[in-house]
């Protein structure tokens, strides 16, 4: 099984989401972050099952949706690399992987 590696950008995005949610509900912020990390860490179990990210239309770049978030990742030869985690409320054209 390939290891899952989180990009610095993905970690920063989760931290930013946590900070935003925390202002409204600290308990929900903890739940969201824990769930996103848990799901991301399990992407190495059949990573091809998730849809191809339409912004890139590359079979290597896929996403896992959860609530209003997308975990975007790339399937590489030796690892699963999580590129970013973002809210689907964001303007997708501003997202850079």
Residue ranges and their predicted role:
Residues 3-57:
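Basic, Lys/Arg-enriched alpha-helical interface segments
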Residues 48-78:
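Basic/aromatic recognition patch in beta-strand/loop cores that engages polyanionic ligands
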């Amino acid at each position: 099984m390939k290891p899952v590696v989180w990009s610095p950008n993905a970690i920063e995005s989760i931290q930013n989401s946590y900070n935003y949610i925390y202002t409204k509900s600290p308990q929900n912020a903890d739940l969201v972050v824990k769930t996103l990390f848990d799901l991301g860490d399990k992407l190495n179990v059949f990573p091809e099952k998730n849809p191809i990210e339409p912004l890139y239309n590359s079979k290597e770049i896929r996403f896992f949706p959860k609530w209003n978030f997308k975990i975007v990742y790339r399937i590489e030869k030796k690892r699963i690399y999580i590129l970013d985690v973002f809210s689907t409320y964001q303007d997708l054209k501003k997202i850079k992987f």
